[in-house]
Amino acid sequence: MADSLAAADGADVTADDLAPGAGTAALGPVVLNAAQRAERTSRAGPVARRLAGTGVTIVALCWVDNTGVTRAKTIPLGRLERAAGWGVGMSPVFDVFLINDDITISKYIGGPGGDLRLLPDLERITPLAGQPGWAWAPVDRYTQEGQVYAGCQRSFTRRMTEQAAEHGLELRMSFEVEWAVGTEDGGSFRPACVGPAYSMTRVVELSDYSREVVEALERQGVTVEQFHPEYAAGQLEISVAAADPVAAADDNALARHTIRAVSARHGFQASFAPSVVAGTVGNGGHLHLSVWRDGQNLFAGGPGRYGLTGDGEAFAGGVLAELPALTAVGAPSAASYLRLVPSHWAGAFQCWGRENREAALRLVTGSAGEQDIRANLEVKCFDLSANPYLVAGSVIAAGLAGIRSGAKLPAEIDGDPAALTADELAGRGIRRLPQGLPEAADCLDRSQVLRRAMGDPLFEAFLAVRRAEAELFGGASADDIAAQTRWRW
């Protein structure tokens, strides 16, 4: 029995039961009126009593900022009813925090003025198995006047999900979670295990820790589909069940927090940084997604290549076309570009391929006889320095733009693009994705698709943070970038 008071029940886009319909996040009102505030306050009472029955005494109200860091304000459980109806105050300036907690400014956000309200999602409040006595609650951010805040990343994802529904589409998403577990030793990373990559030796070395990570996630309603040791030193990975886009982003934020909490209880630290040690394989945050209409997976059962339907191909084509700009969203840190290098299965080239782990966009078709439930897209160039809500919403926006324009996929690539000559790459229309944060920010700045989707306040704040971090790390070495950001995510 999950401890989550309203766990998102989903299916795994990389495994079984991909059909949509479960785990759909409730859509919030655009403007809160007095009756809605009273209704929220009333609903919070039973939730608080149920939380108290599990031993919870304090609630962390959490949001993910434009650097990918989860920020929080906490309240005693007795304040939940008030917070549910009227929120908890915060400054808009958090939207222009940098990864080192410096503050920049954007066209719309910055400075000491203004206030927002954090309203917990009562359907997702979850007792934390790895942090007894605490509960986690993702928040939606509203203005003092009760309007949805234009810079709220979670609301952006919800808005894009609604736009997809207007096209008759349901989306299922899941983020892979890779992390390195270890400790800091004289400024260097010391892995918690020494066994070979993917080996049972690592499982034995971290047996109790690994079991507790999986058990904690399951108790919190996050269904773990797979857990395994990964390639880099001290690196592990989990794959979780799919859900609708908002719930998938919630699950990603909760999974990372849970792993961090369990790690601390074992005397370890968990790093989700794209580059834990410069020059080695980094942590990815690949996104899997499937798109459905009337119960049909648009990536299977159609007349196109590998069973793609027309709208399935158009959605994928839209994502592929926007990948340079999407890279700034899904690989948004200076450390991202220490990971995003060719021939490392990171997806460093703007291309697609069936089951090609070097392509930035991988079509996963599944085995014969079950493609209709398993087929999905994997975006491989993303990592966990990203805000999962911005990633989910931006990918939907790109895919919908592809459907509107009738986008077509180019010829696929079935090997490592890095093995091709410059002339061969040019002849096939394959380009390297941005190789640094300044280039990625420029690509984002030129994207009318993402600007229109996010709206200027959110878009400009996010872009300002990217520009400021590009300047912050402009003269830093790879070793310095990795060391300075290792424990920030």
What are these regions (language model features)?
Residues 2-3, 13-34, 42-49, 254, ...:
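Catalytic-core signal marking the mid-to-C-terminal active-site face
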Residues 2-226, 248-251, 390, 428-489:
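ATP/Mg2+-dependent ligation/transfer catalytic cores
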Residues 53, 165-168, 245-249, 260-270, ...:
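Secondary-structure transition/capping motifs at alpha-helix termini
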Residues 126-133, 170-172, 227-232, 280, ...:
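Short glycine/proline-enriched loop/turn "hinge" motifs that connect secondary-structure elements
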Residues 172-183, 220-240, 270-286, 290, ...:
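Core alpha/beta catalytic barrel or barrel-like domain that forms the active/cofactor pocket
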Residues 181, 190-200, 233-247, 277-282, ...:
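Active-site-proximal beta-alpha loop/turn segments in soluble metabolic enzymes
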Residues 201-209, 226-232, 244-255, 259, ...:
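Short, contiguous, pocket-lining structural segments
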Residues 203-213, 218-224, 238-245, 256-272, ...:
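Accessory "access/gating" subregions that flank catalytic or transport cores
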